[in-house]
Regions:
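Thiamine diphosphate
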Residues: 1-145
Length: 145
């Protein structure tokens, strides 16, 4: 499940995971209010797993709220604890070097899914970014980041 910019990275991850015979339900929230809880509950019931991707920090995040509600209302549907991929709880870095590990990317999503599925996949091997700098989403991006 994702929202905002991280959905682009999630789409990349899902495409790479499909090549490894791992099928994912990707829910793009598009809005965080109202949240389509029935869609989320159905996905958790179907897959037994939940990874929530958030472009906000971990503490006080929408991801935390979604995981909390799933744990309260659908905990018996989960095969394992849910996972949250969000930004760390500190200010966003402004130097190129510090941004390398700050923002979540498709590779991080693949690694989280791999761990959840007890598979030995490496996101960096499955995603070929070529010569695109780590802080540029893709070749079509023309603005500052």
């Amino acid at each position: 499940m994702s929202m905002s910019y991280i959905t682009i990275e999630a789409l990349r991850a899902v495409e790479a995971l499909e090549k490894e015979d791992i099928l994912c339900d990707l829910i793009d929230l598009r809005t965080i209010m109202p949240i389509d809880w029935d869609l989320i509950f159905d996905s958790v019931q179907k897959t037994g797993r939940l990874i929530v991707l958030d472009t906000g920090v971990e503490t006080g995040s929408i991801a935390g709220e979604i995981i909390s509600r799933i744990c309260m209302e659908r905990c018996d549907s989960l095969k394992q604890p849910p996972k949250r991929l969000a930004l760390p709880d500190f200010p966003a870095p402004t130097s190129l070097t510090l941004t390398r590990e700050f923002y979540k990317r498709a590779e991080d999503i693949i690694d989280a899914v791999s761990k959840m599925m007890t598979r030995n996949l490496c996101g960096k091997k499955l995603i070929d970014r070529g010569d695109i700098p780590h802080d540029v989403p893709d070749k079509s991006f023309k603005g500052p980041f």
